[in-house]
Regions:
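Acidic (Asp/Glu-rich) sequence patches and key acidic residues
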Residues: 1-128
């Protein structure tokens, strides 16, 4: 199972910015929930796409960059800073975690200035 996430942080917590990012990007974000020690209002926005290992490859880097690049100036006007935008992949694997990325995709990501994080976690067989 793979969890592809686009995260956008912003300095002024509030639903106004959260809703503006949602409208601007045109995708449904993960619902915001207040955490025990977190702020009373959202200070980040995230979009999640889940795919299983049998699903066709989801090119999350290009898909997320296609969402962000044409809207970057508008995001910056909302108070988002480039450094607070990141893409992440969490991969739950059974036998091996092997990931590869296209060189052009990596160049594009590097030029964007957005962060990338990858977490791999082995799924434990609970059928024993």
């Amino acid at each position: 199972m793979k969890y592809h996430r686009l995260c956008i942080g912003y300095d002024k917590p509030g639903f106004e910015t959260f809703d503006a990012i949602t409208q601007l990007l045109g995708v449904t974000p993960e619902p915001w929930e207040k955490h025990w020690f977190g702020p009373e209002k959202p200070d980040f926005w995230s979009y999640l796409v889940v795919s299983d290992d049998e699903a066709p490859y989801f090119d999350f880097i290009d898909v997320f960059l296609d969402l962000l690049e044409p809207k970057l100036d508008a995001l910056l006007r909302l108070g988002v800073e480039k450094e607070s935008i990141s893409l992440s992949l969490t991969y739950l694997y059974t036998h091996q975690c092997a990931l590869g990325f296209d060189a052009q995709e990596m160049l594009r990501l590097g030029r964007s200035g957005f962060g990338l994080s990858i977490d791999c976690h082995e799924e434990k067989d609970t059928a024993q």
